């Protein structure tokens, strides 16, 4: 059974490995210090090094993951510190030194931080692992999602409407996002392939026959309307607008959109377009992302004060 402590924020610290630079010429050192310039690969330590005011070179930076337990002893509460401050400080110092000795065994390269968060598998004998939340255990991996997208693209059927969808994956999963119909048509693709597609061409103005068919569709879609041909209906006006629809004979043919305005027709068709992507597609948290769903599934890391370690040789 997994430990409940895996969902708690973890603490970590950086260990900076460095080495001293041999002074070949003292004059060059003094001239460099007087000019105030320094190289990006070197730094001047103030009070953190055994040899202050000396130049050192960075060797590597290691990320150390601490235990999930408290860094200090939990027995020393703020109220106990007021009554027994000396004893508590002694316990804190001893516990801090013991924790510091354990840091070397829980270290990794700082560039492996992202892989550590997402790829380490839990162990029943070790409660220091980093894993996903229990509610996200059903989320498939990136490889599984890529295979699923290949099947979706293979089985894609061209719809009757000319619609091209260019948006991000998060927008495809949101039912509130509407898309404008375009001239070109493309199969479901990722944001990268959609960005490489051709530019969208505006729709042409609908001709007379398409406008009449559209009015008939509006009649059939209304609950209280009867299927009637626009040519045989009395008072038929193909270019009817929303401003001159006062008569009862032409009120059934006019709707909230303007037939003479193609932009309103586009807006009406857009609101009734079903998304090509399913809304229940799993999220992929194995790729870097700054959106809300990734921050929710990430683990909070509290960084302690960095340590410095001198490398000899």
UniProtKB/Swiss-Prot annotation:
TM region positions: none
Protein name stated in the entry: Uncharacterized protein YMR206W
Organism of this sequence: Saccharomyces cerevisiae (strain ATCC 204508 / S288c)
Biased composition (Polar residues): 211-229, 261-284
Bias (Low complexity) ranges: 239-260
Region (Disordered) residue spans: 24-53, 190-291
InterPro entries xrefs: DUF4667
């Amino acid at each position: 059974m997994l430990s409940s402590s895996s969902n708690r924020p973890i603490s970590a610290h950086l260990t900076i490995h460095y080495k001293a630079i041999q002074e070949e010429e003292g004059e060059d050192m003094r001239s460099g210090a007087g000019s105030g310039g320094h190289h990006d690969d070197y730094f001047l330590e103030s009070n953190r090094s055994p040899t202050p005011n000396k130049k050192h070179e960075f060797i590597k930076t290691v990320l150390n993951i601490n235990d999930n337990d408290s860094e200090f002893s939990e027995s020393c509460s703020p109220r106990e510190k007021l009554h027994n401050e000396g004893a508590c400080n002694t316990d804190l110092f001893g516990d801090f030194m013991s924790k510091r000795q354990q840091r070397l065994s829980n270290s990794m390269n700082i560039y492996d931080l992202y892989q550590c968060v997402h790829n380490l598998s839990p162990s029943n004998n070790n409660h220091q692992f980093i894993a996903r939340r229990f509610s996200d255990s059903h989320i498939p991996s990136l490889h599984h999602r890529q295979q699923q997208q290949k099947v979706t693209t293979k089985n894609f059927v061209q719809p009757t409407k000319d619609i091209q969808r260019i948006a991000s994956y998060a927008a495809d999963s949101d039912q509130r996002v509407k898309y404008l119909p375009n001239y070109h048509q493309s199969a479901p693709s990722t944001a990268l392939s959609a960005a490489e597609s051709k530019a969208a061409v505006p729709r042409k103005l609908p001709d007379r026959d398409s406008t009449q068919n559209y009015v008939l569709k509006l009649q059939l879609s209304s609950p209280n309307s009867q299927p009637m041909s626009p040519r045989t209906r009395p008072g038929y006006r193909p270019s009817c607008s929303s401003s001159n629809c006062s008569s009862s004979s032409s009120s059934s043919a006019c709707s909230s959109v303007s037939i003479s305005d193609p932009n309103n027709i586009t807006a009406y068709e857009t609101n009734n377009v079903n998304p090509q992507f399913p809304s229940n597609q799993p999220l992929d948290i194995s790729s870097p992302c700054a959106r809300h769903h990734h921050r929710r599934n990430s683990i909070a890391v509290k960084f302690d004060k960095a340590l410095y370690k001198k490398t000899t040789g």
